[in-house]
């Protein structure tokens, strides 16, 4: 008898035409909720509409329908991203000096925005060099285009049109997969298939296609650009693709074709797949041959990873088996039950993804300056500062979002009866120990980090510098960080004998890469000032985590409110007659967590901005390196007064004195954003009753004049007021910082 593997069963994974397409719904705001569909009777309606429009859980309890809406919305999100990208590329094609910058990136500044002189604001068009008048941009697009091998504005036009085509496709896909062929719930829950496709397809083939583009297009074009060839003389991408001899002139191993690949002599390809380390001295960026090698390696890893999970063929890993086998001697049932959670609660899934993505985004921020990936990025200080700040803020918001969705999962999706003695249950049962220990850590870090600063300010004020904690008095050197730096700096000759240079110049040594007389990257020394600020970082991060984690762990119940789960994710208080129960909802913890996230990230970007200007960025002359602020960080950052005087006040002079110059828009934004920030306090420090009384008085006046509105005005609810408050607080604070940073660094960098 013959034994055959079982036939893979054919599953029907879509429903055809589940929801009719109708434009009439567009004319009925709030059609998704019975209470909202009636239309507005009070002004609260518009706030509830915004709060619930994307809260698909509140529209229906059918998980399949929720999943389809989320899936469809993702295509809409991608369409918006493609339209935005297309706009960036169009600006590069139509309003930029990209071709001029490409021919002289060390003297000409990037600009892709030209202000039209409608009411005399053409003063904003500064001279960026090469006879071009425009606003200096700090997005890094020019550098990424150069790294990708873009040599003309026509290519940017073509890509901009391609972006619009892709956006159209995404919008059609979003409609198609909700109205025409909507996936069944089983398709959304098929985690093994999803892992295989996302790992091998998205990450694996995505990296492979980028590696292919780098090898066949970017490397030859950048090699010629680095050698000083005029961009107009460089062959077009398709010529490199179609004519192997052109490539072989630059990378001789191309003449051998695929023979070395199939004969396993892969080292033959080492002319374009390198392992150099360090930075290209011409551009100040990573060697593009290193990054091509890196993406090829990543592609191989992820394509292999995308074949690990069991689908129709009965071989490979099963996620459920992995999770249920994951038990330790002290962890009860281990991860049993988590599979069900992660396949039925998209909030739980989203919380993990946001926490991971947020952490990765912050890691990206730190690599963008220490290992600058694109040509001429490292010497464009405005772009370096912008990219670091941007990725830090994004990471902070993602991490707070993780706390929000973890709490929503516990309130809406968690079923305690199915989770007995697994890790989640055990964490929830000893939450008091977790939170009280974390609270102790926060108190310790807060008093000690702040205490060191208060000591220094007091000694400085009393004229006793010899009794301060500083590099020139009582030293508190960050010895562990210095040990890590030295280990990495010594690696090339020691633990990594094949590496020509350390992974980053920041680790130490004597190397300095300068491009056009500007420092690209050099060793970053750490001292007492960094030790002090580091502990402020530790403090603010731990407090943010304390607030978010307390919100998550006590989202279903607490000693104060044992039935909290019944009150939902957001509620103002536990009903009338129970004093002292306001601001305890999971939503309120997210609200408070946002302020501490803002604190934490602000200290990080201030530290980065000042440290780089003091110890890294600057010009190289015959006498040595002249840093922008002359190395004043080590002495001044050891007191709070030093931060206020030598960082905030000293460096705000550019934005405050920007009127009458091309930077004046930053002066206006600095003022306006301060106003938005202050406006937020009106919402955060006021009571609802105060506004309701005022509104009723104003309505009385309208009634007197017979102009009373049909929709009855209402004061914002407590939670709506706090949401408006925190939104303006963050918007005002971030925009103020943005104007302060850019006016400063564009003026001096």
From Swiss-Prot:
Binding positions (chlorophyll a): 682, 690
Localization terms from the record: Plastid, Chloroplast thylakoid membrane
Record's function text: PsaA and PsaB bind P700, the primary electron donor of photosystem I (PSI), as well as the electron acceptors A0, A1 and FX. PSI is a plastocyanin-ferredoxin oxidoreductase, converting photonic excitation into a charge separation, which transfers an electron from the donor P700 chlorophyll pair to the spectroscopically characterized acceptors A0, A1, FX, FA and FB in turn. Oxidized P700 is reduced on the lumenal side of the thylakoid membrane by plastocyanin.
Binding site for chlorophyll a': 674
Protein's recorded name: Photosystem I P700 chlorophyll a apoprotein A1
Protein source organism: Zygnema circumcarinatum
Any single biological process term in GO: photosynthesis
Enzyme class of the recorded protein, top EC level: oxidoreductase
E.C. numbers: 1.97.1.12
Bound cofactor: record note: P700 is a chlorophyll a/chlorophyll a' dimer, A0 is one or more chlorophyll a, A1 is one or both phylloquinones and FX is a shared 4Fe-4S iron-sulfur center.
This protein's encoding gene: psaA
Keyword set, alphabetical order: 4Fe-4S, Chlorophyll, Chloroplast, Chromophore, Electron transport, Iron, Iron-sulfur, Magnesium, Membrane, Metal-binding, Oxidoreductase, Photosynthesis, Photosystem I, Plastid, Thylakoid, Transmembrane, Transmembrane helix, Transport
PROSITE patterns recorded: PHOTOSYSTEM_I_PSAAB
UniProt cross-references to InterPro entries, sorted A to Z: PSI_PsaA, PSI_PsaA/B, PSI_PsaA/B_CS, PSI_PsaA/B_sf
UniProt binding sites for phylloquinone: 691
Topology with respect to the bilayer: Multi-pass membrane protein
GO cellular component term, pick one: photosystem I
Positions annotated to bind [4Fe-4S] cluster: 573, 582
Family: Belongs to the PsaA/PsaB family.
Main location per the UniProt record: plastid
């Amino acid at each position: 008898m013959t034994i055959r593997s079982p036939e893979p069963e054919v599953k029907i994974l879509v429903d055809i035409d589940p929801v009719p397409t109708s434009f009439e719904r567009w004319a009925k705001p709030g059609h998704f909720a019975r209470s909202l569909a009636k239309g507005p009777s009070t002004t609260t309606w518009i706030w509830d509409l915004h709060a619930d429009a994307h809260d698909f859980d509140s529209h229906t309890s059918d998980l399949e329908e929720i999943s389809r809406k989320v899936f469809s919305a993702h295509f809409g999100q991608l369409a918006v991203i493609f339209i935005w990208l297309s706009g960036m590329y169009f600006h590069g094609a139509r309003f930029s000096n990209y071709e001029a910058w490409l021919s002289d990136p060390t003297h000409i500044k990037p600009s892709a925005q030209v202000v039209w002189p409608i009411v005399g604001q053409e003063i904003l068009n500064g001279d960026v060099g090469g006879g071009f008048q425009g606003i200096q941009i700090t997005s890094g697009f020019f550098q990424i285009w150069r790294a990708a091998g873009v040599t003309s504005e026509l290519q940017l036009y073509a890509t901009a049109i391609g972006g619009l085509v892709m956006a159209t496709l995404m919008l059609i896909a979003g409609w198609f997969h909700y109205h025409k062929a909507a996936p069944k719930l089983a398709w959304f829950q098929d985690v093994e298939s999803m892992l295989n496709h996302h790992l091998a397809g998205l990450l694996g083939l995505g990296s492979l296609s980028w590696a292919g583009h780098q090898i066949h297009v970017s490397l030859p074009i950048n090699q010629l650009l680095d050698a000083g060839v005029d961009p107009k003389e460089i062959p077009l991408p398709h010529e490199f693709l179609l004519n192997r001899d052109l490539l072989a002139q630059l990378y001789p191993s191309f003449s051998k074709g695929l023979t070395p690949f199939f004969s396993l002599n892969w080292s033959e390809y080492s002319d374009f797949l390198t392992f150099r380390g360090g930075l290209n001295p011409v551009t100040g960026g990573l060697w593009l041959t290193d990054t091509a090698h890196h993406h090829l390696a990543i592609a191989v890893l992820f394509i292999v990873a995308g074949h690990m999970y069991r689908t129709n063929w009965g071989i490979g890993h099963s996620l459920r088996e992995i999770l249920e086998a994951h038990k330790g001697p002290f962890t009860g049932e281990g991860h049993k039950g988590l599979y069900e959670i992660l396949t039925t609660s998209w909030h739980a899934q989203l919380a993990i993804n946001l926490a991971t993505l947020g952490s990765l985004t912050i890691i990206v921020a730190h690599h963008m300056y220490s290992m600058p990936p694109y040509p001429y990025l490292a010497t464009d200080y405005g772009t370096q500062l912008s990219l670091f700040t941007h990725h830090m803020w994004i990471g902070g918001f993602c991490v707070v979002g993780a706390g929000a969705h973890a709490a929503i999962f516990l309130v809406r999706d968690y079923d305690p009866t199915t989770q007995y003695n697994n890790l989640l249950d055990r964490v929830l049962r000893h939450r008091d120990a977790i939170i009280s220990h974390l609270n102790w850590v926060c108190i310790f870090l807060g008093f000690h980090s702040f205490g060191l600063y208060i000591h220094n300010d007091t000694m400085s004020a009393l004229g006793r510098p010899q009794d301060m904690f500083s590099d020139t008095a009582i030293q508190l050197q960050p010895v562990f960080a210095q040990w890590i730096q030295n280990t990495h700096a010594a690696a090339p000759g020691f633990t990594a004998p094949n590496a020509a240079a350390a992974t980053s110049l920041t680790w130490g040594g004597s190397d300095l890469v300068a491009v056009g007389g500007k420092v690209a990257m050099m060793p970053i020394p750490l001292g007492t000032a960094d030790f002090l600020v580091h502990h402020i970082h530790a403090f603010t991060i731990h407090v943010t985590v304390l607030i978010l984690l307390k919100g998550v762990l006590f989202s279903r119940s607490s000693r104060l409110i044992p039935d909290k789960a019944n009150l939902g994710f957001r509620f103002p208080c536990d009903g009338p007659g129970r004093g002292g129960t306001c601001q305890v909802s999971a939503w309120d913890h997210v609200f408070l967590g946002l302020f501490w996230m803002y604190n934490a990230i602000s200290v990080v970007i201030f530290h980065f901005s000042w440290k780089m200007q003091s110890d890294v960025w600057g010009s190289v002359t015959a006498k040595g390196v002249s840093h922008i602020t002359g190395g004043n960080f080590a002495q001044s950052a050891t007191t709070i007064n030093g931060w206020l005087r030598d960082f905030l006040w000293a460096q705000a002079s550019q934005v405050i004195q920007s009127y009458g110059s091309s930077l004046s828009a930053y002066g206006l934004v600095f003022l306006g954003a301060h106003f938005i920030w202050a406006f937020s306090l009106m919402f955060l420090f006021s009571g609802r009753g105060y506004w309701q009384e005022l509104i009723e008085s104003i309505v009385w006046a309208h009634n007197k004049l017979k102009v009373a509105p049909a929709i009855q005005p209402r004061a914002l609810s407590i939670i709506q007021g706090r949401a408006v408050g925190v939104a303006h607080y963050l918007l005002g604070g971030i925009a103020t910082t943005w104007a302060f940073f850019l006016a400063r660094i564009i003026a001096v960098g």
